[in-house]
Amino acid sequence: MADQKRKLADPDAEAPTGKMARAGPGELDLVYPFWYQVAAPTEITPPFLDPNGPLYSTDGLLNVRLTAPLVIIRQSNGNAIGVKTDGSITVNADGALQIGISTAGPLTTTANGIDLNIDPKTLVVDGSSGKNVLGVLLKGQGALQSSAQGIGVAVDESLQIVDNTLEVKVDAAGPLAVTAAGVGLQYDNTQFKVTNGTLQLYQAPTSSVAAFTSGTIGLSSPTGNFVSSSNNPFNGSYFLQQINTMGMLTTSLYVKVDTTTMGTRPTGAVNENARYFTVWVSSFLTQCNPSNIGQGTLEPSNISMTSFEPARNPISPPVFNMNQNIPYYASRFGVLESYRPIFTGSLNTGSIDVRMQVTPVLATNNTTYNLIAFTFQCASAGLFNPTVNGTVAIGPVVHTCPAARAPVTV
């Protein structure tokens, strides 16, 4: 009878899967039938969700798959989908996406889109090819030209381009020369001179003889700058006479050294035992004058000082670089003569040999000049010893050589 009632109550019910649980004391079991145990709820997936589509569910929530540049933007009133941008793209006040354009640049926006501000004097938009192309505006006769390789410079036979540098093309057989200072002119300095940037032709000699005198005949003015073989400069007096007779230069030199006016004589064996010193005779008084030969007297007065430049000997010594050397100079060549000087006080160096040599000298302006070097070679030491005092005078020391040119006027 009990089985018949159970079937009538639920004819489609399945047989119990487990032991029927009874309500314990104080519990109310409202499940009917009381023996039925509830299984885990079945998750229902709507049939319109494609597992590979942009929508998916997580924990019963519908979600959207996002890829860059779409992102979830967290806001105070809830999350929303937005576009991630950098400084080149912005969202305007109407919520529309737009390109961010710097106000300092040449780009601008119009109703038709983005445009470019250009200088019509230097740039042009060329539409001849069917496409609007930005180009450089070239002047018709401005020496610039364009080709498939780019913009270039049009040059004639007087110019050339070397290592991407525009240069003047100089005829190797001509008188022009190119240096770091620019384009210059090579000329015969016996016939021409440059004065204040102007090339001038030397005037024809107006006299067969020209003379130059400098210093004091009494050897009482120690204005000369001499230098010892220990490379110590000192003061000395001189009297100089030079005569150019139709291209033959005769130089007569007197020298006097007074220990009371020569200046400081350094101590030490190297300095005290020095026996040689050099005097330079120069006709370039402002350009290259190591012994400080003073402005003297010219006869005739319109004679150029270049009239007293000695000619360079074919066997002249190498160029003496005044930029790298103290102006002591001792040549192994040239004329050598022996003299007996006049001494006073305790100073006595014995006889003095003098070697005279025309020497090319590179001055501080990087120009080479011909000077006459007089190297005085004392037989014994004493002149540069601070404990020895007195004077020594020698002269005339005479040197004769060809002049660089016959006497010329200014």
Curated annotation (Swiss-Prot):
Cell location: Virion; Host nucleus
Induction (UniProt): Expressed in the late phase of the viral replicative cycle.
Biased composition, class Basic and acidic residues, residue ranges: 1-10
GO biological process, alphabetically ordered: adhesion receptor-mediated virion attachment to host cell; symbiont entry into host cell
One GO cellular component term noted in the UniProt record for this chain: host cell nucleus
KW Ribosomal protein (keyword) present: no
UniProt signal peptide: none
The organism's place on the tree of life at top rank: Viruses
Pfam families assigned: AdHead_fibreRBD (PF16812), Av_adeno_fibre (PF06536)
Transmembrane regions: none
Entry annotated with the keyword Transmembrane helix: no
Keywords associated with the record: Capsid protein, Host nucleus, Host-virus interaction, Late protein, Viral attachment to host adhesion receptor, Viral attachment to host cell, Virion, Virus entry into host cell
Major place of residence: virion
Family: Belongs to the adenoviridae fiber family.
Assembly and oligomerization: Homotrimer. Interacts (via N-terminal tail region) with pentons.
Miscellaneous comment as given in the Swiss-Prot or TrEMBL entry: All late proteins expressed from the major late promoter are produced by alternative splicing and alternative polyadenylation of the same gene giving rise to non-overlapping ORFs. A leader sequence is present in the N-terminus of all these mRNAs and is recognized by the viral shutoff protein to provide expression although conventional translation via ribosome scanning from the cap has been shut off in the host cell.
Function, as annotated: Forms spikes that protrude from each vertex of the icosahedral capsid. Interacts with host receptor to provide virion initial attachment to target cell. Fiber proteins are shed during virus entry, when virus is still at the cell surface.
Protein name as it appears in the record: Fiber protein 2
Source organism: Fowl adenovirus A serotype 1 (strain CELO / Phelps) (FAdV-1)
Lineage: Viruses, Varidnaviria, Bamfordvirae, Preplasmiviricota, Tectiliviricetes
